[in-house]
Each structure stands twice: as C-alpha cells, then as structure tokens.
Amino acid sequence: MPVGTAVHEKTFQLCESLSYREWSGYYAVSVYETHHEHEYNAIRNAAAMIDVSPLHKYRISGKDATKFVNRVITRDISKVAVGQVIYCCWCDEQGKVIDDGTISRLGENLYRWTAADPNMRWFHQNALGLDVTIEDISNQLAALAIQGPTSGRLLKQACDADIANLKYFRHTHGRIGGVPVDISRTGYTGDLGYEIWIPWNEAPKVWDALVERGRHFDLHAAGILALDVARIEAGLILIEVDYSSSKKALIESQKYSPYEIGLGRLVDLKKEYFIGRAALEGENRTGPRRLLTGLEINWDDVERLYDAIGLAPRVPDTASRVAVPVYHGGLQVGKATSTTWSPSLKKMIALASISGEDAAPGTQLQMEFTVEATRHKVRATTRGLPFFNPPRKVATPIV
C-alpha cells in the first residue's frame, strides 16, 4: 500500500479532488481541483509547486565514484564540472535503455543520482572491484519542483542563494525557511524551473516558506495530470509509456536504444568503455530502425468525425498514455505513445515512435482516433521536438 511523501500532510489539505495515484510506493496527487486547468496554467504562466519526492535518489561516493559513473552511463562524466547537472541514460550490454535520469556532481568523487525506477542492485552488480559507496537516499531526501515563468523571482525572494545567476543545469546551496537545501535549475516541464532537494523531515517547513513567499507570484500546487501535459509539450519521455526499460521488456521489440528514443545526443562513443558501447557503436553506423518524433494531429479531421455524428468536438480532458497505431499509406509504421491537447499551442500533439524512413519532419501520416467507440484515422504530421521551448528556460540572469 502506498504511503505519504514528506509533504503529504500539506498536499492532502489542498487536494479537493482526493485524486491520487501510486508513484514508486508513494501517494502522488493526480489533480488538486476537479480539473488540472489552473495547475497547468500555473506551470506556463506563473509558478507551480510539484512534489517529486517519489523519485529514486542515490548518493555515489568514494575514490572510484567517477570511474563507476562513467562505466554505467553513456555520457562522459569526466567532462562535467562540480556544480553541474546532466541528463543521461544507462543501458544493458545490448545497448538497450534501462532507465534515464539526472546526475548532479556535488564534488570530485561525489554524485547525486535520480532515476525513475529502482537501480540499486544493478548499480552494485556493476561496481565490482571499485572503491565506491552507493547509498539509496530516496527516503532521506524530499524534492519539490518549482516551475514556471515566475519561479526564479519567487526563489530569489525565498532563498539566500544566488538564484538570479544560476545557470541552466547547474546547482547551488542555500536556505529556505531556515532549512539547508540544494537547488538545481532543472525540471520536467520544459520551462523555467528549479528542483529543491530537502532533508526529508524538514520538507514541510520548506513547503510552508515557499507557499508564504509564493502568494506574491501566483504559486499553485500542481499534480501529475498538469505535469503530464507540460512534459509532452516539452518533448520529454516517460519510462513505461514512451519506452520500456530493457529490464522489464518481455520481447525484443519492447526494448529501445538511446538512438530510438531521442537520446542519441547523450551517447559519447569517444570515451572509454561503458556498458552497451559495442552495441551502440554498431547502431551508430547502421542507424536506428525507429525514431522518436513529434506529431501534430489535424484538428479539422477530428472536427469532421464529431460533425458526422452530430456532436461538438471534444478536447481531451487529460493526456493519454495509451499507445495508438500510426499509419503511412495504409501500413502501420509506428505508434503514438503520449497524446495531449496543448492549451498553449492550441493543437493536439503526440510523442510517437515511428520507423526511421517515415519519421522525417513534415511527413504526412495517419493516426488512429476513436470517437464514440468507433475507430477512425486522422491526418498527423511529423515534426521535431520539443513543441514548446521558451527562451526563458535557459536565460541567465533571471530578472
């Protein structure tokens, strides 16, 4: 049975919908009100606070910590400075992705690693012969994401750290409400945003301090439904939705390489040995058989389907995590894995896994679309990702 996070007593007081979902053994708010509209608008137009404490978190230390990290991930951690954060993935020997997450370099041989799934056993299996300590600190460290255009100004008021000059994918230290915290300029919304890493038992104090300061910046608590829409707009993948971990895949077609899910840029074939390198070198030469791409669904086609049965077109209430077939010339060439109506773009969009020859931007495809339990096809055009990428996301300084 799930348990509450470090700030469950705070989120529960605000959760009018009483709508929760299980996330890594914790209760996570799906939506605070009866609809996530206000929460989404906070992410895109003001500031939103999201409890991301259920993330799996690890502390890597010891003389061989850097060597261990480089053995496991596809990027070269030796190029990463202390104070920097990277997004990365890690693979099995066949070059298929096990998980993705972020690594913060806290010291020369000290790292904080976040992941979607549990990885402790696999980490230990690949640390043999190394002087490295791997600690699961998931229930010692809470995390709050502050995301949105006013998030930087809010944190400038709430924290004693130099937030104004904190660069994208860097981290710093400070105090909020008298509590020592780490702050990284990272997030899962594709917008200006930060993640605050807090000692578990001190998290309610930080929540209260942010709420108090946030009154002047239109801060709202936001749940998973609003976050889902934002991350699709940002072109950010979700494990077990847009790809399957190779540890859980039952058949080969359920396994994905970094090149197949838009993470090819994270593969550094110039560095020393890492797990999966040989397989990825081969795929780099031949090219992946499928690619992650964006889809823009033709809304005129959707309207015509509703018109034909005498109904007004219906904008989907929530993002869909159900895979639906995508066709080209009557043949299935892939699937849309995450689909949503984008309130900011006023378009229906999707993340899709499409065969390489059909994934070029501007390709006209068809996507399955169901109206009143009847399946149809609507036109969909491939395009690059992300759909939404505001300059403020990476701008420095924050004013």
Residue ranges and their predicted role:
Residues 1-15, 20-23, 28-31, 104-399:
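Conserved, structured C-terminal
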Residues 1-91, 96, 292:
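Acidic, proline/glycine-enriched N-terminal capping motif
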Residues 50, 98, 301-303:
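Residue-level micro-sites within transmembrane alpha helices that shape
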Residues 51, 100, 195:
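Acidic active-site catalytic centers that drive phospho-/nucleotidyl reactions
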Residues 71, 75-129:
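Well-ordered mid-protein domain cores that form the structural environment of catalytic cofactors
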